[in-house]
């Protein structure tokens, strides 16, 4: 019988020492109104908690584990690297090798800087954009998350283009007011804004495939519009591919949609599950960063040899066997088509959206194109679906506004088991609609 007694006790103790008992808010399970399982180990497609429950994992550490948990080749590379020392604060050959592999996957990243997190990557990319253009204003889109730096933690009010209002206490109004938010997938709003004040904007930053309001692909022409207006007005286009990089395709969303950004931010998969992110782009722009140029960016643990080893091993496997990208996408297609078939069978309004190997099940009867669409989905039905799956060994993101992911270890048996549990969950929801 499914139970989380040990996890519940562990959570209560954790709350005494950490805010809310966690180190990232979504892990608290507050959005689904419960307590989280505390994880003890993971292997392949499976994750295990301290109550000895086993789950098929579709969170995959929020995306990084495309090779599955504890990939033997990645683990072996770490076991070999750790005895040589865990941090030097000095250049290593590994850094250059990783940069070369990243560039091979994404040629737009001509010069690359290694950092420790996606937040560092986006924060630094914005500083570079502002320093390079000599402008202060940036544009982001409602529902796109780019880390928790002050300039990006803002929300929109009413109107076409809203100058930033802080989305968290502690974010100064003066910092946020240079951030302009627009609706995702709204090309007309972008054009209108740039017609009015385009020559004052340093950059647009965008998730080319939104993943932080659930999986929301770009509408045809949207990314093209961003590229067109930024070029016309001397602003930079920054792709935040922290989530969709290596998920949308082998070369990220920029390859899938054939759009070349000025700067790209990567994380998650690029570190193979370790704290590592990168940002990079055109040589002329990136060479403005110290010590090559005047724009300052630094980090004590940037290029950490253990994290770089993990990333290098992961990218080496993906480079050696590019069929992995098709395999994980095919598995995602099979899974999502199964969800759609079952939901239709039980007359449960569901829209399943996916790009590459990332997906979200939205409990709604219309396609989700922006944050307002996502926010209008049925949260109670999501909770029913989520809890039935969790209690039957299927581990999804504990929020209706998150993406889920598939790894190379999710074989046909895992897909079949997942769909069998989904069948039960959709039937349960259907019974409430009678």
Task: Give the positions of each predicted feature.
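Conserved N-terminal phosphate-binding loop of PLP-dependent enzymes in the Aspartate aminotransferase
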Residues: 1-434
């Amino acid at each position: 019988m499914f139970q989380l007694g040990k996890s519940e006790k562990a959570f209560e103790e954790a709350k005494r020492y950490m805010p809310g008992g966690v180190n990232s808010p979504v892990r608290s399970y507050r959005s689904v109104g419960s307590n989280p399982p505390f994880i003890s180990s993971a292997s392949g497609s499976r994750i295990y908690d301290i109550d000895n429950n086993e789950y098929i994992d579709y969170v995959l550490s929020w995306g990084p584990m495309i090779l599955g948990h504890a990939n033997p080749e990645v683990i072996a590379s770490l076991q070999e690297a750790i005895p040589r020392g865990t941090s030097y604060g000095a250049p290593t050959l590994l850094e250059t090798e990783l940069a070369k592999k990243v560039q091979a996957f994404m040629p737009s990243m001509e010069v690359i800087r290694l950092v420790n997190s996606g937040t560092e990557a986006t924060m630094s990319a914005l500083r570079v954009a502002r320093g390079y253009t000599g402008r202060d204003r940036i544009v982001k889109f409602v529902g796109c998350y780019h880390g928790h730096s002050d300039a990006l933690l803002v929300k929109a009010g009413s109107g076409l283009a809203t100058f930033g209002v802080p989305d968290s206490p502690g974010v100064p109004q003066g910092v946020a007011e240079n951030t302009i938010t627009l609706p995702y997938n709204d090309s007309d709003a972008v054009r209108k804004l740039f017609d009015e004040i385009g020559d004052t904007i340093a950059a647009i930053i965008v998730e080319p495939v939104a993943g932080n309001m659930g999986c929301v692909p770009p509408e045809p022409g949207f990314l093209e519009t961003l590229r067109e207006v930024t070029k016309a007005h001397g602003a930079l286009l920054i792709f935040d591919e922290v989530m969709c990089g290596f998920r949308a395709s082998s070369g990220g969303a920029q390859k899938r949609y054939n759009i070349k950004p000025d700067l790209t931010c990567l994380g998650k998969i690029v570190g193979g599950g370790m704290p590592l992110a990168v940002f990079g782009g055109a040589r002329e722009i990136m060479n403005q960063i110290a010590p090559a140029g005047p724009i300052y960016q630094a980090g004590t643990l940037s290029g950490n040899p253990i994290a770089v080893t993990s990333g290098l091993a992961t990218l080496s496997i993906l480079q050696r066997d590019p069929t992995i990208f098709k395999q994980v996408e095919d598995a995602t297609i099979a899974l999502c088509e199964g969800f759609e078939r079952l939901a239709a069978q039980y007359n449960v309004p569901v829209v399943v959206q996916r790009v590459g190997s990332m997906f979200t099940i939205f409990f709604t009867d219309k396609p989700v194109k922006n944050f307002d669409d996502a926010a209008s989905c049925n949260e109670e039905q999501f909770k029913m679906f989520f809890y039935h799956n969790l209690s039957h060994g299927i581990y999804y993101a504990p929020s209706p506004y998150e993406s889920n992911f598939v790894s190379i270890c999710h074989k046909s048996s895992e897909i079949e088991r997942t769909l069998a549990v989904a069948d039960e969950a959709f039937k349960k929801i259907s019974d409430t609609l009678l």
